[in-house]
Amino acid sequence: MNIDIKISLYKLVHCKFFDPDQMNIFLKSLKGIAEETRLRILALCGKTELSVSELTSILNQSQPRVSRHLKLLVEAGLLERFREGPWAFYRASEKDRPDGFAPALLALIPLNDPVFEEDRARLEMVRQNRISKAESFFKQNAKEWDGIRRLH
């Protein structure tokens, strides 16, 4: 077992609860990851910000199902939701929590597992698709770009 995993396990096992609410936060976080799809989502959102449609594509699951998992992860404090224009994106929580749970958990995810490896391969395809769409958009709109920027 490498030193990073030992440190993460230590942090996970020795979480300090500063008040009764901390215990509830910790238990809610445990419930939040108590399902394979949610653990996969957390691993993906620990790498980059993703939209619901991108996650449905990577996970090959329905939008309602992915949205439900995202809701539970946000409520557990493991993911953050933010809007960018009409889209909602999710990322691993950057909030500083005294229990150190989310970073410790991310360090323990078995990334060499075939399921996580497949997810990362599909994530790379999503990233490449984003790049292609952005390049295409700017090629099509380069001449009018100054006018487009004035609209926003």
Name the predicted role of every residue range:
Residues E75-E84, R91-S93:
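Beta-hairpin "wing" of winged helix-turn-helix
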Residues E36-L39, S51, L79, S132, ...:
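A general structural signal for well-ordered secondary-structure junctions
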Residues L70-K71:
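Short, hydrophobic-biased segments on the C-terminal half of alpha helices
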Residues N24-R65, P86-D96:
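N-terminal helix-turn-helix DNA-binding core of bacterial DNA-binding proteins
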Residues S57, V74-E75:
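Alpha-helical residues within the helix-turn-helix
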Residues N2-I25, R97-L151:
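Amphipathic alpha-helical dimerization/coiled-coil segments
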